[in-house]
A protein has these predicted regions:
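N-terminal, post-signal-peptide metal-ligating segments of extracellular/periplasmic oxidoreductases
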Residues: 19-97, 101-113, 165, 181-212, ...
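Low-complexity, Pro/Ser/Thr- and charge-rich linker/hinge segments at domain boundaries
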Residues: 26-28, 150-168, 305-310, 321
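Short, hydrophobic/aromatic beta-strand segments
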Residues: 47, 83-90, 141, 221-228, ...
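Short, flexible loop/turn segments at beta-strand junctions in immunoglobulin-like
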Residues: 66, 116-120, 264-266
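Beta-strand-rich extracellular modules
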Residues: 78-80, 130-134, 267, 279-281
């Protein structure tokens, strides 16, 4: 017990003392031909501590891809790792030979070039490995990115859509770091939150309507999203794209892999600080991230040691400027 408690303190203490960091906004790629290089990298999530990572066209995570509906796109995916992986286009309606599942291995040093027509409506999708038995490890180490599809209907709507100004991707993930600051997998002690690969992030937002594209990129944690001032926000899209009418809510639950687009109105809040939170205390038992998953703690090692489970916690700080 003492050993486990010491390990937990070691995991949490860097997070407690870690200073706030500006939210990283992934780079973008657009057009009809995309070159994606899967590679190793190194990131200092904690000052002076190098953490080995995986990334696409960078050290961690992947660029945001912009597709236009009905375009035919070619994606040249090169695997620079020393072991096989795959890339799956999560949520896209594409032929099975281009899906990127476990049956479509990209061997080390090789390039896979799927080519398909973009059939989905405007919305937020994502891409990540889907190898047999390796999906969790590869995603946890950093292989994940957003896909934004645009179409003629969405472009006519009065919505924020200036990327990185009033339209932000938020890849929300929980992670475990061991005492050597290395990313650990296959554990339920995921007590460190990241948004776009940033620990303890803040974002300066304009005093207006702002669009957020939420992706629950965690392995098995469900979030009950809400704002710290408990104000209403508006859901405008789900996994499948835009919904018919904005849905006014003050809570939004997303399971792993799910996406949603929301609009938050920061008008009249100049100078204020508001947090995007998860109200996990409100999750029903049986849901991953709740107090009790009702599966027997023996089947989920360390689940009941995780301080986030069943707790309300901050995810991202908004500073209205």
């Amino acid at each position: 017990m003492i050993k486990k408690l010491f390990g937990l303190i070691a995991l949490l203490s860097p997070y407690i003392i870690f200073s706030q960091n500006p939210l990283f906004i992934p780079d973008t790629l657009s057009g009809t031909a995309f070159n994606l290089n899967i590679q190793t990298g190194t990131v200092q999530f904690f000052p002076g501590q190098n953490t080995p990572t995986y990334g696409i066209n960078g050290n961690f995570l992947a660029p945001t891809l912009f597709f236009n509906k009905n375009d035919t796109v070619t994606l040249n995916v090169t695997n620079n790792l020393i072991f096989p992986t795959t890339i799956h286009w999560h949520g896209l309606h594409i032929p099975p030979e281009f899906d990127g599942g476990p049956h479509q291995i990209i061997s080390p040093t090789s390039t896979w070039s799927p080519r398909y027509r973009v059939m989905n409506d405007a919305g937020t999708y994502w891409y990540h490995p889907h190898g047999n038995g390796t999906t969790e490890l590869h995603v946890t180490k950093g292989l994940a990115g957003i896909i934004i599809i645009r179409d003629s209907i969405e472009s006519t709507l009065n919505l924020p859509r200036t990327y990185g100004v009033d339209d932000f991707p938020l890849i929300i993930q929980s992670r475990v770091f061991d005492i050597f600051y290395q990313i650990a997998g296959f554990t339920h002690e995921d007590s460190i939150m990241m948004v776009n690969g940033t620990i303890d992030p803040y974002l300066q937002v304009p005093e207006q309507m702002v669009r957020f594209r939420l992706l629950n990129g965690s392995v098995d944690r469900t979030y009950q999203f809400g704002l710290s001032n408990d104000s209403t926000f508006y859901q405008i899209a789900t996994d499948g794209g835009l919904i018919e009418q904005p849905n006014a809510v003050n809570r939004l639950m997303l399971s792993p892999g799910e996406r949603a687009e929301i609009i938050v109105d920061f008008s009249g809040l100049l100078g204020q600080t508001i947090y995007l939170m998860s109200y996990a205390s409100e999750l029903a038992n049986g849901i991953m991230g709740s107090t009790d998953v009702s599966m027997g703690m023996a089947t989920l090692p360390d689940y009941n040691n995780n301080p986030l489970n069943g707790a309300d916690f901050n995810i991202l700080e908004f500073n209205v400027k």
